[in-house]
Amino acid sequence: MKPIIYIKYGELTLKGKNRTQFIKVLVHNIKQILIQYQNLTYCVGYDNLKIINLENYNLKQIIDDLKEVYGIAFICIAYQVDKELSEIQLACKEFINDYEQTFKIEARRSDKSFKYNSMEIKQMCAAYLLQNSPLLKVDVHRPQLLINIEIKYDCAIVYGHKIMGAKGLPVGINGKALVLLSGGIDSPVASRLIMKRGISIDFITFITPPHTSQKALDKTIALAKQITLDNKLTKANLYVCNFTKLQDEIAHISKESYRITLMRRYFMRIAKRLAISVKANALVTGEALGQVASQTLNSMQTISSVLDNFLVLRPLIAYDKEEIISLAKRFNTYELSILPYDDSCSLFAPKNPTTNPNVQTAAKLEEESLVLDAIYELVYTKEITKINLS
């Protein structure tokens, strides 16, 4: 009996009107993550997807890949058989090992015309297993093995252990955002969380050579590739902005404590213009409220005021550092993020950054320079390069 992979959809099942589009996007994303596996067959159902023709592949590796795809509730190894009791019983036996264990059977009928009801299916399959496997015992409360039987209109599906999927919504179903990506821990995690809500992403990062090194940029590129799993989770581009000219001019402002605030205001201005040009509907940052001096409410308001109500998403706003680090390890970005290469913000930070900036003071400081806006225009038009992550 040949196993198949059986996938149950996640939240998208709730979206009645948009179900067809949601499933279409999810199936496309699954095919992308499994693109290296040839000759697989995908059978799309109302609330499930079956993947067959798996004989030549490592099922564990395929399942590990599928666990990264947003929109999947759970994944399992299953058997698809004819709607004959004897076939269903044999499929149940595939999950039995040669050692003592407890089990329980659950059954559900989509096809109510099947000649046995759910209770009868459970009883007859359990009796068959007990007769053929003397080490088995029934435990309906805390079984070591739970066998699920689903009677469909065209077949029966039998599966055991459920492997939790990434849940969320299929990437690409909810538009596009531009992520301000640094080399730190937070923004890569923010990227994945925003993808979980069905948003596809591009990245922008800011470099300040010679103050930042090529290794720092290489680290950011590696992070972008890990976030997107080499562009299998979403087709993303990384835009690299050489910010050195602006940074050098901002260094001359009269209030050193506002240096980071002004730098971030220009980050936002550049990111907004780029977002509009790449048809992104929002910016995404890795800010977490109160985590560092520049991430207070006043600071966020002062920095975001340059955007004229362009949407900024901050998925980490209520997370503490330990939670963010835990997620970074889950997404395999943590070890890259802690590589010792400084980014623009860390190198440029004053000794005592203001935690209580205001819009009026920031705007007045920007007006001190007669050339700041001209340099900003030059940087946006001449100092941004695009890196394809594929």
Swiss-Prot record:
One BP term from GO: thiamine biosynthetic process
SUPFAM superfamilies hit by this protein: Adenine nucleotide alpha hydrolases-like, THUMP domain-like
Alphabetized GO MF terms: ATP binding; CCA tRNA nucleotidyltransferase activity; tRNA binding; tRNA-uracil-4 sulfurtransferase activity
Reaction catalysed by this enzyme: [ThiI sulfur-carrier protein]-S-sulfanyl-L-cysteine + a uridine in tRNA + 2 reduced [2Fe-2S]-[ferredoxin] + ATP + H(+) = [ThiI sulfur-carrier protein]-L-cysteine + a 4-thiouridine in tRNA + 2 oxidized [2Fe-2S]-[ferredoxin] + AMP + diphosphate; [ThiS sulfur-carrier protein]-C-terminal Gly-Gly-AMP + S-sulfanyl-L-cysteinyl-[cysteine desulfurase] + AH2 = [ThiS sulfur-carrier protein]-C-terminal-Gly-aminoethanethioate + L-cysteinyl-[cysteine desulfurase] + A + AMP + 2 H(+)
Localisation per UniProt entry: Cytoplasm
GO terms under cellular component: cytosol
Cited SMART domains: THUMP
Keyword terms: ATP-binding, Cytoplasm, Nucleotide-binding, RNA-binding, Thiamine biosynthesis, Transferase, tRNA-binding
Start and end residues of each THUMP domain: 60-162
Keyword Transmembrane helix: no
Binding-site residues for ATP, renumbered to this chain: L180, L181, T205, F206, R264, G286, Q295
Keyword check for Disulfide bond: no
Gene3D superfamilies from the UniProt entry: 3.30.2130.30, HUPs
EC number, as in UniProt: 2.8.1.4
Enzyme class, spelled out: transferase
Pathway listed: Cofactor biosynthesis; thiamine diphosphate biosynthesis
Family assignment from sequence similarity: Belongs to the ThiI family.
Function, in words: Catalyzes the ATP-dependent transfer of a sulfur to tRNA to produce 4-thiouridine in position 8 of tRNAs, which functions as a near-UV photosensor. Also catalyzes the transfer of sulfur to the sulfur carrier protein ThiS, forming ThiS-thiocarboxylate. This is a step in the synthesis of thiazole, in the thiamine biosynthesis pathway. The sulfur is donated as persulfide by IscS.
Name of the protein in its database record: Probable tRNA sulfurtransferase
Gene that produces this protein: thiI
